[in-house]
Amino acid sequence: MAASYSVPSMIMEEERRFEAEVAEVQAWWNTERFRLTKRAYSARDVVALRGTMRQSYASNELAQKLWRTLKTHQANGTASRTFGALDPVQVTMMAKHLDTIYVSGWQCSSTHTSTNEPGPDLADYPYDTVPNKVEHLFFAQQYHDRKQREARMSMCREERARTPFIDYLKPIIADGDTGFGGATATVKLCKLFVERGAAGVHIEDQSSVTKKCGHMAGKVLVAVSEHINRLVAARLQFDVMGTETVLVARTDAVAATLIQTNVDTRDHQFILGASNPNLKGKGLATHLSEAMAAGKTGPELQAIEDNWLGMAELKTFSQCVTDAIKKMNLAEYEKQRKLNEWMNHSSYEKCLSHEQAREVAERLGLPNLFWDWDLPRTREGFYRFQGSVEAAIVRGWAFAEYCDLVWMETSSPDMVECTKFSQGVKTLRPELMLAYNLSPSFNWDASGMNDNQMMDFIPRIAKLGYCWQFITLAGFHADALIVDTFAKDFARRGMLAYVEKIQREERSNGVDTLAHQKWSGANYYDRVLRTVQGGITSTAAMGKGVTEEQFEEKWTRTGATNLGDGSVVIAKARM
């Protein structure tokens, strides 16, 4: 008879703690925060991936704050408006007026990579680049929050009542590009974002190998299912860390011209194929390979591709069927009946697979219709894709369950597009929050809008559900504009340019960098020194002799100032 086995108490306790944590995670998922969220894994999976030492993250408080902010805007039909911040100066100025902060991959790529090597937005910088910028700004936010508290607690109550409180801790939403590789790369990227201070992250559905700025050409999509895997990987990492980090799914389906694979049936209706039967057999990639082997290069290869594509009569399968029905030798009413039946079965909402669409075409009398999506594939193996708002809507439906907001990247500020996408995606996901890129890549003056329409654009699309709107590169452009105009003026007018265009403007607009020593926290560290040294220090940075006293209202200096050239002026304060 086998001896009975007694489970050690340590093992029992380990299991008890594990099961308690599983129940805790499940209860968390059952809260209102995750009512619309679908997960492809269980609470047991999450707890098994955690360590035994529980950790908390400051970014989670801001993630919860971000969620409340966005849900309030959604309920009110308004929008959180923000832009890409370059540095701590910008993030502290933005805190006075805006309720969220954006960190752009484009801005990081061009101005602040972790290797210090700048370049265009191709997501080829090290993947810690944007998390590092998030940390840079998040540390600044926390520092200025500490600095403000010290300053306010040094005031009497009456002075505090007169001094506006600034919430420096505005939630940061960061650019996660494509997730920087496979699922494990996305997991590690998201871990970095949480640790570095991001309250939200967006991830797009381009190929990580060929990723481009959303307003460049040559964009290649991944399959719907692959991007869902990225979103699942991101959410899993947030769950493992116990955070409510806001996840934004971006789609580039409007302007994309290529897609990596045809493996997902939801993509089938948007893939282009050759409809000219005279090209049956050898594909474009084979023609190009043979031409290269024969010594052809550059313009010659481009001419071969252009000529082949010109003959291919590229169409979606739906367009091919529609054209074939119109050419049938039938009475007009019968053609129209078949067209109506085809459109009823093949509308984009149905998301027919190619095989299903073929079956419908056969029932309509088109059993051997020539259409081939493999023939026009590129040398890299990509399929041709017909980008459209409809393609973005289909992807929005698919992504919505796995994210918190959906962002459709567009090529212009088009109210018709915004309305079409919002109405389309909300037919299946009515509670979905939307994001919109108020891109500086658009020539807004060429958009057809007048000034009033531009001013009303944000509130108008906010009513459609776009509750987070952002200018990706406004920090970059604002920085360039002020430095270029000031440098030009300074070269011409010297110190008058600085005083007139910067110092006086800072004073008249109440910009706190006018007193830059105070802004940088010299008073804060004077208090640190006094605290360390028993309440007194002879080396205080803001003590007697600091030039910043010249910016106080009570300060004035009269008398002669020697200019060094034998002349003197009577100095006076401009207060």
UniProtKB/Swiss-Prot annotation:
Broad class of the protein's primary localization: other
Subcellular location: Glyoxysome
GO molecular function per UniProt: isocitrate lyase activity; metal ion binding
PROSITE patterns named in the record: ISOCITRATE_LYASE
Keywords recorded for this protein, A-Z: Glyoxylate bypass, Glyoxysome, Lyase, Magnesium, Metal-binding, Peroxisome, Tricarboxylic acid cycle
A GO cellular-component term linked to this record: glyoxysome
Keyword Cytoplasm: no
Enzyme nomenclature, EC number: 4.1.3.1
Catalytic reactions on record: D-threo-isocitrate = glyoxylate + succinate
Biological or metabolic pathway of the protein: Carbohydrate metabolism; glyoxylate cycle; (S)-malate from isocitrate: step 1/2
Binding, Mg(2+): 175
Record's keyword annotation contains Ribonucleoprotein: no
Top class in the EC scheme: lyase
Residues bound to substrate: 104-106, 214-215, 250, 437-441, 472
Complex formation: Homotetramer.
Reported function: Involved in storage lipid mobilization during the growth of higher plant seedling.
Protein name: Isocitrate lyase
